[in-house]
Amino acid sequence: MSWIERIINKSIITPTRKANIPEGIWTKCDSCGQVLYRAELERNLEVCLKCNHHMRISARVRLHAFLDQCSKYELGSELEPKDILKFRDSKKYKDRLIAAQKATKEKDALVVMKGTLYGMPIVAASFEFGFIGGSMSSVVGTRFVYAVEQALLDKCPFVCFSASGGARMQEALMSLMQMAKTSAALAKLRAQCLPYISVLTDPTMGGVSASLAMLGDLNIAEPKALIGFAGPRVIEQTMREKLPAGFQRSEFLLARGAIDMIVNRLDMRWRIARLLAKLTSRPPLKSTNSQENTC
């Protein structure tokens, strides 16, 4: 017992308790450092409430927020990746797949859904960056083609949200073939005059940016998204020159005509719906930016 406890009446001494706060309640913004309430950040679609920084969001959460709630149906969910080449670098490809599937609860890096957007029939796809960097595998390419074929069958628009490091090196040439495969599928969509909107999110790089991500009738980007083929560090090392500030960011690309517009994630659902209404000669939507996706 300390000397202060001997002097002061024990009845007025209240032992302190450690606050029992569960993990994951709070998170910090990568851009401004603001401490954010996790549940509030999720309601705001992973956009910082202080600085508007767009954090990465899972493919499934993005699609559920984008499409009308009562109409979603997943396509290609039965497809799973195979380690045909028995590839191994610092780790077996098979083990990488198991770890990625466990971490993301997805079978591969692309989720495709058929549904409606403000009542308009639509097919939408979204990359899961948490699955081996959103890299494009044979399954990703096949699911993308499934999405295009469904859009052709339903004669409806197709929207794809890209977030990828490029082709999956563990599948070698089979992964590179998906660039041509997805591009050929999109050519069929264009031949039928069906709209394809590509939304480039952070990051969209490599073989994905060199194929399906830049082939949209409209190419939209989220704010400050990294978009390019090789990364800025690789370019600097190759050219031995310092790159301009903001190089390969969506604002830099918009100023030079490489993309069509930049749209905040919270406005994306409404803006795309309005664009598709015009592209498909539908009646204009009511002039309200409602983010509710109920039917």
Swiss-Prot record:
A zinc finger (C4-type) spans 29-51. It is found in: Cytoplasm. InterPro entries: AcCoA_carboxyl_beta, Acetyl_CoA_COase_Trfase_b_su, ClpP/crotonase-like_dom_sf, COA_CT_N, Znf-ACC. GO terms for biological process: fatty acid biosynthetic process; malonyl-CoA biosynthetic process. Gene3D superfamilies: 2-enoyl-CoA Hydratase, Chain A, domain 1. Belongs to the AccD/PCCB family. Component of the acetyl coenzyme A carboxylase (ACC) complex. Biotin carboxylase (BC) catalyzes the carboxylation of biotin on its carrier protein (BCCP) and then the CO(2) group is transferred by the transcarboxylase to acetyl-CoA to form malonyl-CoA. NCBIfam families: accD (TIGR00515). This is Acetyl-coenzyme A carboxylase carboxyl transferase subunit beta. The gene is accD.
